[in-house]
């Protein structure tokens, strides 16, 4: 028993020398490094560094305008003046830029027509009365054809008024109403003259507009 106690007492110093004390992980090991990683305070930035950072901000991200500038709107006169200046052409038009025309082109010539179409529609409206007038007026698209139809219908109206007035087959149509006879007679005469006069004016248009810029002509029948 005494020998066992003596052996145990001899082994304890040797084992105690091999142990190592461990640190607690929750305790901070190096507080100096944590303090070193923190950013410096604003008071430590010098005046030159502050000016440098202000310059960088102004160049990359410009500051917005002040409240007075942002909320100031132009007056009504200024807005109208700006709108007027925007509509003014940069290069004003000049008359010499347009090229004169020696004669009407094919489309204008088709729109005006010729004497043959005028005479054809004139006799159609004169011989076939209102049926010939509607056919010749609707089937032709030229001014000569339509003016010929109007003139022929006017002469046809005069023809039938004279037939009814002086014929023995239609007695009593205008008894006591001679003003109505005169109204239809004057109306037919005006239609006849209008067709001839307007067609004569249209025929002179190629000569009138030969030296003028290109112009659209609207025929009102």
UniProtKB/Swiss-Prot annotation:
InterPro entries linked to this entry: NEDD4/Bsd2 (IPR019325)
Keywords: Acetylation, Cell projection, Endosome, Golgi apparatus, Membrane, Repeat, Secreted, Synapse, Synaptosome, Transmembrane, Transmembrane helix, Ubl conjugation
Location(s) in or outside the cell: Endosome membrane; Golgi apparatus membrane; Synapse, Synaptosome; Cell projection, Dendrite
Topology Extracellular: residue spans: 138-143, 194-221
Main location: membrane
Record-annotated membrane-spanning stretches: 117-137, 144-164, 173-193
Reported phenotype of the disruption mutant: Mutant mice appear normal at birth, but develop severe skin and gastrointestinal tract inflammation around 6 to 8 weeks of age. They do not survive beyond 14 weeks. This phenotype is due to the lack of activity of ITCH E3 ubiquitin-protein ligase, and consequently, prolongation of JUNB half-life after T-cell activation. This results in an increased production of T-helper 2 (Th2) cytokines and in the promotion of Th2-mediated inflammation. This subsequently leads to increased number of circulating, esophagus and small bowel eosinophils.
Chain segments carrying region Disordered: 18-44
Pfam families reported for this sequence: NEDD4_Bsd2
Tissue specificity note: Highly expressed in embryonic and early postnatal cortex (at protein level). Widely expressed. Hardly detectable in resting T-cells; up-regulated in T-cells in response to activation.
Post-translational modification remark: Ubiquitinated by NEDD4; mono-, di- and polyubiquitinated forms are detected. Ubiquitination regulates its degradation. Undergoes transient tyrosine phosphorylation following EGF stimulation, most probably by catalyzed by SRC. Phosphorylation SRC is enhanced in the presence of NDFIP2 which may act as a scaffold to recruit SRC to NDFIP1.
Gene Ontology annotations of biological process type: CD4-positive, alpha-beta T cell proliferation; intracellular iron ion homeostasis; metal ion transport; negative regulation of CD4-positive, alpha-beta T cell proliferation; negative regulation of inflammatory response; negative regulation of interleukin-4 production; negative regulation of isotype switching to IgE isotypes; negative regulation of protein transport
Motif placement: PPxY motif 1: 39-42
Region described as Interaction with UBE2L3: 2-41
GO CC terms, sorted: cell cortex; dendrite; endosome membrane; extracellular region; Golgi apparatus; Golgi membrane; membrane; perinuclear region of cytoplasm
UniProt induction comment: Up-regulated after traumatic brain injury in surviving neurons around the lesion site.
Modified residues (N-acetylalanine): 2
Cytoplasmic side: 2-116, 165-172
Motif (PPxY motif 2): 64-67
Function: Activates HECT domain-containing E3 ubiquitin-protein ligases, including NEDD4 and ITCH, and consequently modulates the stability of their targets. As a result, controls many cellular processes. Prevents chronic T-helper cell-mediated inflammation by activating ITCH and thus controlling JUNB degradation. Promotes pancreatic beta cell death through degradation of JUNB and inhibition of the unfolded protein response, leading to reduction of insulin secretion.
Domain topic, free-text comment: The PPxY motifs are required for E3 ubiquitin-protein ligase binding and activation and for ubiquitination.
Name of this chain's protein: NEDD4 family-interacting protein 1
Lineage: Eukaryota, Metazoa, Chordata, Craniata, Vertebrata
């Amino acid at each position: 028993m005494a020998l066992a106690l003596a052996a145990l007492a001899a082994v304890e110093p040797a084992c105690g020398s091999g142990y190592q004390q461990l640190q607690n992980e929750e305790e901070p090991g190096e507080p100096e490094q944590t303090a070193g990683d923190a950013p410096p305070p604003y008071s430590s930035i010098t005046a030159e560094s502050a000016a440098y950072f202000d310059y960088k901000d102004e160049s990359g991200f410009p500051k917005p305008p002040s409240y007075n500038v942002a909320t100031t709107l132009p007056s009504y006169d200024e807005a109208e003046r700006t709108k007027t200046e925007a509509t003014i052409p940069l290069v004003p038009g000049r008359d010499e830029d347009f090229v004169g025309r020696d004669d009407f082109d094919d489309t204008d010539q088709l729109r005006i027509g010729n004497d043959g179409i005028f005479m054809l529609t004139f006799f159609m409206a004169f011989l076939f009365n209102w049926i010939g007038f509607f056919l010749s007026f609707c089937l032709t698209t030229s001014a000569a054809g339509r003016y010929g139809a109007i003139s022929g219908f006017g002469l046809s109206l005069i023809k039938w008024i004279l037939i009814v007035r002086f014929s023995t087959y239609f007695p009593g149509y205008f008894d006591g109403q001679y003003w109505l006879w005169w109204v239809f007679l004057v109306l037919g005469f005006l239609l006849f003259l209008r067709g001839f006069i307007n067609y004569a004016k249209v025929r002179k248009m190629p000569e009138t507009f030969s030296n003028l810029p290109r112009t659209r002509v609207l025929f009102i029948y």
